[in-house]
UniProtKB/Swiss-Prot annotation:
<dbReference type="GO" id="GO:0005741">
    <property type="term" value="C:mitochondrial outer membrane"/>
</dbReference>
<dbReference type="GO" id="GO:0051388">
    <property type="term" value="P:positive regulation of neurotrophin TRK receptor signaling pathway"/>
</dbReference>
<dbReference type="GO" id="GO:0098939">
    <property type="term" value="P:dendritic transport of mitochondrion"/>
</dbReference>
<feature type="compositionally biased region" description="Pro residues">
    <location>
        <begin position="423"/>
        <end position="437"/>
    </location>
</feature>
<feature type="modified residue" description="Asymmetric dimethylarginine; alternate">
    <location>
        <position position="341"/>
    </location>
</feature>
<keyword id="KW-0009">Actin-binding</keyword>
<dbReference type="GO" id="GO:0006898">
    <property type="term" value="P:receptor-mediated endocytosis"/>
</dbReference>
<feature type="compositionally biased region" description="Basic and acidic residues">
    <location>
        <begin position="182"/>
        <end position="202"/>
    </location>
</feature>
<comment type="similarity">
    <text>Belongs to the SCAR/WAVE family.</text>
</comment>
<keyword id="KW-0206">Cytoskeleton</keyword>
<dbReference type="GO" id="GO:0032991">
    <property type="term" value="C:protein-containing complex"/>
</dbReference>
<feature type="modified residue" description="Phosphoserine">
    <location>
        <position position="489"/>
    </location>
</feature>
<dbReference type="GO" id="GO:2000601">
    <property type="term" value="P:positive regulation of Arp2/3 complex-mediated actin nucleation"/>
</dbReference>
<dbReference type="GO" id="GO:0005739">
    <property type="term" value="C:mitochondrion"/>
</dbReference>
<feature type="compositionally biased region" description="Pro residues">
    <location>
        <begin position="347"/>
        <end position="374"/>
    </location>
</feature>
<feature type="domain" description="WH2">
    <location>
        <begin position="497"/>
        <end position="514"/>
    </location>
</feature>
<dbReference type="GO" id="GO:0003779">
    <property type="term" value="F:actin binding"/>
</dbReference>
Amino acid sequence: MPLVKRNIDPRHLCHTALPRGIKNELECVTNISLANIIRQLSSLSKYAEDIFGELFNEAHSFSFRVNSLQERVDRLSVSVTQLDPKEEELSLQDITMRKAFRSSTIQDQQLFDRKTLPIPLQETYDVCEQPPPLNVLTPYRDDGKEGLKFYTNPSYFFDLWKEKMLQDTEDKRKEKRKQKQKNLDRPHEPEKVPRAPHDRRREWQKLAQGPELAEDDADLLHKHIEVANGPASHFETRPQTYVDHMDGSYSLSALPFSQMSELLSRAEERVLVRPHEPPPPPPMHAAGDARPTPTCVSSAAGLIENRPQSPAAGRTPVFVSPTPPPPPPPLPSALSTSSLRASMTSTPPPPVPPPPPPPAPALQAPAVPPPPAPLQIAPGVLHPAPPPIAPPLVQPSPPVARAAPVCETVPVHPLPQGEVQGLPPPPPPPPLPPPGIRPSSPVTVAALAHPPSGLHPTPSPAPGPHAPLMPPSPPSQVLPASEPKRHPSTLPVISDARSVLLEAIRKGIQLRKVEEQREQEAKHERIENDVATILSRRIAVEYSDSEDDSEFDEVDWLE
């Protein structure tokens, strides 16, 4: 419905009702018509004055804008004409310190406001009937809303439009985030290699020489793989086996020097396991104890020196494990093949007689067994048998942490009695771990190549070659002299000042988060009825969405 800005009254000059009792009606109508014409002329002159006043105001504002634009052009022309090319145009400091350009012009918005209401419309508005005085009830409302807005609300349509615009902008942002999350969650598909076209020319070429000379497709494929990846090594194609009987020609003492060195070189690359058995589980450590799996070797030089180099030295009987022991870990990097081979060149001592078989389990439970000693095995033994476990006399303490897999230990040169007595006492054993960790294997574990920082290996004098194998004693049966000592903590004590400082830092971080949240809320509250801000934000979101959609379309097209 159009709004009538100016209404000229009276519209009908002669359409009037004549009063009763008038004798000369023609004269009365003429006078009334002339009066209405005069009223129309006065109304027209008044509106003409309003129109010319508005034109004058518009011309004045236009002149002001033109003058301000002319001043800006003059300043720019002076700066352009008087620019010295020898001087530095713009320093880096000016670029970083200068703020971004922001226009000072105010965009025209909220055109239909009470302040911009024309005078004729204001007069028409004043003629209208007044609404009921509901504003008197506004101070008594708890929700803070104006009472008159329930009867008439001029800003209702603008608020409805503003809510719709902001909701559309937020929906577009949510859709954009959802699309990005979907692209991140989507797994990276491998590049699809196009299938080569089927060509029967190669088959006909193979059959042209005769079916006898035609090569098998599997052989061709194997050749292509060898050409692409290189020939496979011998130890990779050879199946891994487990030797159950090491007597006779399988004994290490009966091997020649060349075969023995070959076996030692392969020991770093291959681990023998019994077939049809799964590999042992990895060692379990305490939570947070991330350390590499320790590799262990006990007196590897003694293993090589105790082996005779000539096969004529005789065959040594070998004790073989009746139960499948876990495989040993690979040799450490510090023990190279060259050092092993160099140690083989030394003069070997006379062969050591084999140890006696392990005693019966009933005889291996002494009243107070000695501390665990390294397991001693004769040359040629690959996997020792785990000795039986002595029954605990008292309630066992928390189980010891599970150590690395069982390693092959070999005898070392026994020390003279004087040297054994002159050695310092061994340090105390490592402290027990918290309960819940799996107990260690009954077989004595060799020295660790990379022990953790919290544990200290306990070196003990090696017994003679004829010493019987003794089972390790449970943790509860260890002598009182070897109880773990309580070392004082080396961690620095946090003083009250440091705790106060940490608390202040935490509070500062929390305050910073609260301030950032308030700034975001203030930005949202700053919108209010700014039409230009709402429209610019909507345009920016739509523009970014259009760019993202084009990128997604390109990705889908490439796929």
